[in-house]
Amino acid sequence: GIEEIIATGEFSKISGAVDEDAEDGPQNLRGFHTAEKMLFLDGEPRDLETSPFAKNELEYLKLVSERMLSDTQDLYNGWLKGLGTSDVPSSYAEAMKKHDGSAYSIGNVYQAIELMLYGNNGMAGISNEVGSAKITDPVTAWNGSNKDATDPNNPGVLAVESWYSWNSLDDYKNNIVSIKNAYFGGRDLDEESASESSLH
């Protein structure tokens, strides 16, 4: 895990061509929450005067940050122009707009809308993840625990997604706000002010 990598400086698990499966270890050792663990302590930004970074932590944080930047660039480029790979050969945005079957098997407007609304990566998938996993898992674990929030091994505390920074509630709220924004076609819109791009 993260602590082992920091202790040993064995970064081969997280850099270079490693397993990209979201369910497998390497992918889960180099994302946002890994950086969060190193930047926050007990829900507060880490005080470097009292808790300075060790050499391996700095290197780990650098590698994780580079990976997040690369992933963000790939997401942007995949949407805008494609990555030229078998998974993302051309612009996903254009495929959604054209919905003519020429790319990504999006053959009509209904398939494009269905992708946005349903499935693991659609609005329904995100809202279900917030409700059934991000909120339910910690509550269930907490209810079955000693209910001691100061216990560093309390499963209810450890099940909270952003427990290093304690930003989980903001994360959950913003997940739902992102669904609302996508549904109404812009930020801070509603039924009365929905844009032409709205699914409403």
Locations of the language-model features?
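Mature extracytoplasmic or organellar-lumen-exposed domains after removal of signal/transit peptides
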Residues: 1-200
